[in-house]
Amino acid sequence: MTTNPKPAYQRILLKLSGEALQGEEGFGIDPAVLDRMAQEVKELVELGVQVGVVIGGGNLFRGAGLAEAGMNRVVGDHMGMLATVMNGLAMRDALHRAYVNARVMSAIPLKGVCDDYNWADAIRELRQGRVVIFSAGTGNPFFTTDSAACLRGIEIEADVVLKATKVDGVFTADPVANPDAELYDKLSYTEVLDKELKVMDLAAFTLARDHKMPIRVFNMNKPGALRRVVMGEAEGTLINADA
C-alpha cells in the first residue's frame, strides 16, 4: 500500500550497476532483466517523476582487472567507458520498446551513435518527461560510474541519487558473508565514513557529501522496490546530512 498519494521525489538519478543487467548470466546483458528494469522506470515516468540514469559497465568490461595484468589504466578506463555506452544503448532500446521516450548522452563524443552530453539539453529533456541515460562515466579515466552518478545528480539538481544494488541497503557487515548483519534505515555521511561502510568509492561519496546530495541504497532485484523508494516508503538505506 502506498502511504503518499504522490511521489516523494520529482527528479531522481538512478545508478544501476552493469552487473545488475547480467542477471543470472555470468556476462553480458540478460534481456529479461533489462526489460523488467525498463518497466520499473516506465512506472516512475507515468507517475510524473523525471528520471536520469547512469549505468556501470562491469558486465561487459572491467578495466581495473586488466590494469593489474599490465594494461595501461587509461586505456582500460576508456574501454570501460565504452562498455557503459553499450549498456546505455541497450537500456534506451528497452525503454523505447516499452513506449518510453529516452535519450543517451555520452561524456565522450560518439557521433552517429548517441548525443554528446550537454547540461542544458539534459535538463530540457528531463522537463519534457524523457528519460536521460548518461553514459561514458565522467569522460575521464580514474573516475568510477558512482562518481559519474553523483556528478550528474548534482548537475541536474536531482532530489536524490538512488544506488541500485543486489542487497537491501547498507548493512553493519556484508550480509552475504554474515547473515546476522543488520540493515541501517538511515545514516549520516559522517557515520558512513566513521564506520568505514562501503557505500561507494570515496571520491564519489565525498562529492555527494560536499554538495549535500542524499543517497538511497536499495535492492533493484526486489520487485517494486524502486517505486516504493520514489513514493517515500521505507525501503533501503537513506544517507544524508542528518540521519
Swiss-Prot record:
Pfam families: AA_kinase. One of its GO terms (cellular component) is cytosol. It catalyses: UMP + ATP = UDP + ADP. Its main location: cytoplasm. Gene3D superfamilies: Acetylglutamate kinase-like (3.40.1160.10). Allosterically activated by GTP. Inhibited by UTP. Its EC number is 2.7.4.22. It is found in: Cytoplasm. InterPro entries: AceGlu_kinase-like_sf (IPR036393), Asp/Glu/Uridylate_kinase (IPR001048), Uridylate_kinase (IPR011817), Uridylate_kinase_bac (IPR015963). GO terms for molecular function: ATP binding; UMP kinase activity. The keyword NADP does not apply. One of its GO terms (biological process) is UDP biosynthetic process. ATP binds at residues 15-18, 58, 62, 165, 171, 174. Keywords: Allosteric enzyme, ATP-binding, Cytoplasm, Kinase, Nucleotide-binding, Pyrimidine biosynthesis, Transferase. Pathway: Pyrimidine metabolism; CTP biosynthesis via de novo pathway; UDP from UMP (UMPK route): step 1/1. Belongs to the UMP kinase family. NCBIfam families: pyrH_bact (TIGR02075). Catalyzes the reversible phosphorylation of UMP to UDP. PANTHER family: URIDYLATE KINASE, URIDYLATE KINASE PUMPKIN, CHLOROPLASTIC. Homohexamer. This is Uridylate kinase.
